[in-house]
Amino acid sequence: MPDPAATRAGAARARATALARAGERLDRLSLYPRPVRRERVRIVVAPFAFRLPWLRRFDGYAAWGLILLRSAAEDDDLLTHELCHVWQLQHRPLRMPLSYLRSGYDGNPYEAEARAVVAATRRPAVAATAVATATATATATATSA
């Protein structure tokens, strides 16, 4: 029978490695004045949280220094997307979450920026203009608020 402590330690190492990979993807970009600070970011696999009606449609959720994931399956794109939200929150701790009240999820410029970041860092062929466009939209929306 496997040792539960060793299993937990292995899972924690895997999450830390995945977080480092996501951070390296974000480090290639200069969307914000400072790079994402990931030292205190915790990843918690919490499938029960995604039974809540307002989280049901998501596979991940970021709140400041916490990233909740529906499953333990490694998905670098999802983790990069959520870590991008942590980065956004580090630079716009009030404006970013309040933007969901104004524009909802589907039309939210911070969501567009996180999706563009994933696309731009996944494939080198994707033009950097996708990130620049999403950032310009997020900035224009945030400054008009």
Predicted regions: what they are:
Residues A63-S71, T80-L83:
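Polar-ligand-bearing catalytic/cofactor-coordination segments
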Residues L31-R34, F50-R51, R57-F58, L68:
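Short, flexible, glycine/charge-rich loop motifs used to bind or transfer phosphoryl groups or to couple energy/partner
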Residues M1-A46:
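A metal-dependent hydrolase signature that marks the N-terminal structural subdomain at the beginning
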Residues R8, R13, T17, T129-S144:
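Compositionally biased, intrinsically disordered low-complexity segments enriched
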Residues L52-R56, A62-A63, A73, D77, ...:
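Post-HEXXH active-site segment of zinc metalloproteases
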Residues V45-P47, R70-A72:
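Pocket-edge structural micro-motifs
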Residues A5-A6, E24, T80, A116-A127:
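Short linear elements at protein peripheries
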